Amino acid sequence: MAFVPPQAGYDRAITVFSPDGRLFQVNYAREAVKRGATAVGVKCGEGVVLAVEKRITSRLIEPDSYEKIFQIDDHIAAASSGIIADARVLVNRARLEAQIYRLTYGEPAPVSVIVKKICDLKQMHTQYGGVRPFGAALLMAGINDRPELYETDPSGAYFAWKAVAIGSGRNTAMAIFEEKYRDDMNLEDAIKLALMALAKTMENPSADNIEVAVITVKDKKFRKLTRDEIEKYLSEVLKEVEEEEVKEKEEDYSELDSNY
């Protein structure tokens, strides 16, 4: 008789809790996000920034066709990590909900309303048979009265953040945000902080494998940065990172000298 692990029944069933209160399929969906490319978001008084790593696996792929930041409405955007096909379904649903709200009420949808709609859909996929959880997390950003930034989890939970990261580089990026985030940052500072957090999680950061979008308080319009703009900000950030690393090495050497 083949050995069956004790958790196997809970492992296969999406709607059954394990004895210790877990839904294994939801945990596995979170693992898919942890393996995904890093995406970061930073909020400031002038607007909100989204930046993502584009993992282009072949030089034959057209970089512009590999989209990781999506426009939901004029004033709302989303960045994804995890299974990109799952993220696309969620993005299309968010776009639909935003248009339904606009047609029904004659005004742009609040960011929080669209986030809740998407997370309601995610939660449904943890509760019913015949479906599986979405293996994707979204960072959703937008502006109604003020800048807003949310993280959505495969379980259907969502949280508002000042700065946040998802994907394989989450821990590294969050450590940088904890150290360097300031409430009085302007939009340029927020872009540089997002790029710094992203660059620290990547082997060879460049304008070709990074995508950045902003929504400003001034016009409440979604806009992707051009390659030249990304290159300009990234060169400044990489120079700053290099200077910090040199300074850290000098401090380490001086500490060693003082011990002799």
Curated annotation (Swiss-Prot):
Compartments in which it is found: Cytoplasm
Gene3D superfamilies in UniProt: Glutamine Phosphoribosylpyrophosphate, subunit 1, domain 1
InterPro entries recorded: Ntn_hydrolases_N, Proteasome_alpha, Proteasome_alpha-type, Proteasome_asu_arc, Proteasome_asu_N, Proteasome_sua/b
A GO term, aspect molecular function: threonine-type endopeptidase activity
Inhibition and activation profile: The formation of the proteasomal ATPase PAN-20S proteasome complex, via the docking of the C-termini of PAN into the intersubunit pockets in the alpha-rings, triggers opening of the gate for substrate entry. Interconversion between the open-gate and close-gate conformations leads to a dynamic regulation of the 20S proteasome proteolysis activity.
Main location: cytoplasm
Highest rank taxon of the organism: Archaea
Annotated GO biological process: proteasomal protein catabolic process; ubiquitin-dependent protein catabolic process
Entry keyword annotation includes Magnesium: no
SMART domains noted in UniProt: Proteasome_A_N
Assembly and interaction partners: The 20S proteasome core is composed of 14 alpha and 14 beta subunits that assemble into four stacked heptameric rings, resulting in a barrel-shaped structure. The two inner rings, each composed of seven catalytic beta subunits, are sandwiched by two outer rings, each composed of seven alpha subunits. The catalytic chamber with the active sites is on the inside of the barrel. Has a gated structure, the ends of the cylinder being occluded by the N-termini of the alpha-subunits. Is capped at one or both ends by the proteasome regulatory ATPase, PAN.
Function, in words: Component of the proteasome core, a large protease complex with broad specificity involved in protein degradation.
Family, per entry: Belongs to the peptidase T1A family.
Designated name of the protein: Proteasome subunit alpha
Organism lineage string: Archaea, Methanobacteriati, Methanobacteriota, Thermococci, Thermococcales
Name of the gene: psmA
